[in-house]
Swiss-Prot record:
GO molecular function: tryptophan synthase activity
Alphabetized PANTHER family for the sequence: TRYPTOPHAN SYNTHASE, TRYPTOPHAN SYNTHASE-RELATED
This protein's name: Tryptophan synthase beta chain
Keywords (A to Z) from UniProt: Amino-acid biosynthesis, Aromatic amino acid biosynthesis, Lyase, Pyridoxal phosphate, Tryptophan biosynthesis
Encoding gene, per UniProt annotation: trpB
Enzyme class: lyase
Amino acid sequence: MTSTLPSQPKDMELANSSRPSVHGRFGRFGGQYVPETLMPALAELEKKAAEAWQDSSFTNELSHLLKTYVGRATPLYEAKRLSQHYMSREGGPRIWLKREDLNHTGAHKINNALGQALLAIRMGKKRIIAETGAGQHGVATATVCARFGLECVIYMGQEDMERQALNVFRMKLLGAKVQSVTAGTATLKDATSEAIRDWVTNVESTHYILGSVAGPHPYPMLVRDFHSVIGEETKQQCKEAFGRSPDVLLACVGGGSNAMGLFHSFIEDLSVKMIGVEAAGDGVNTKRHAATITQGSVGVLHGAMSLLLQDSDGQVQEAHSISAGLDYPGVGPEHSYLNEIGRAEYVAVTDKEALNALELVSKLEGIIPALETAHAFAWLDTLCPSLAPGTEIVINCSGRGDKDVNTVAKKMGFEI
């Protein structure tokens, strides 16, 4: 199901997306809806981040670690058998994968965790907290804390801990304390709420490495900027591979960090169609989904105004997805803005469609994608028949599926 797109965005609207207003807003979305206790910490974070980006010692260290520790640049891989699968008599698109699954820790999340850890050190913060759903951001945060000798506490919903037991052990092995959250739905929303409570209590000694382009300003901008290396590399790699920008960008969207990292470098290039794929769960016509943009309304969650899943009284509703990383009733404010001005299109696919796509990609390409990433692959069934032959598609392969094997096996009727 797609959202209705308004007329083509104006140059000014696109420029507004590059950097939010002084009040941290993308259009009407964003802002800082937080306790007064956190305002100095947010101001310090914005100031230190701005200074860091102008400091060559910071950018050089970040670039060096992205290369030698994370393993960047990640390759742009031509998925020939997947492309062949969608070929018709007239031809078909060519499908490329931006291989963020090949990063150290197995997903895009470490780009942001590494950058924020370096910022925390600059601010003199020795204790790090983070929230996690699928566990990938938790693992990435625990990894960089081990690298720099920082205390690490990860908040994770009890349901997600059961779904992602392997990642829970990885975090503990890396020296992190994993704090179970049993409140509410015991998933990502509740883990985020608990992390924010911790931060309010320990703001002087603690830095919160928020894992998505959500939350109060400057986090949506900060997380996006650390992930923008994805799109920067993709733009250059596309020129080398086929001499121009891609026609279509595809990425899954929960909070939206991997999608924003891919989209950011292409926002002002209107020849590039950008599609974010949300989780439709059991179907958007049911109450068990996480299709925030395609089904949500404007509200405030975790410090920012954005599109949310909420009832008529403004109470945030439970989200559902087979993917723990997409199981979130909100979305980053910049995604809400890009949807509102018509620069990006947002669609949704079901659990079943994502599982089918995961199996298809595994068998055709020898790559087992994360369940989150599988949602982006699933949209190819709808997208490809409408495309002209020779269309160049780039899918952000945001993470590998090792963490999801137990979940997938159970759904397919296998005992492990």
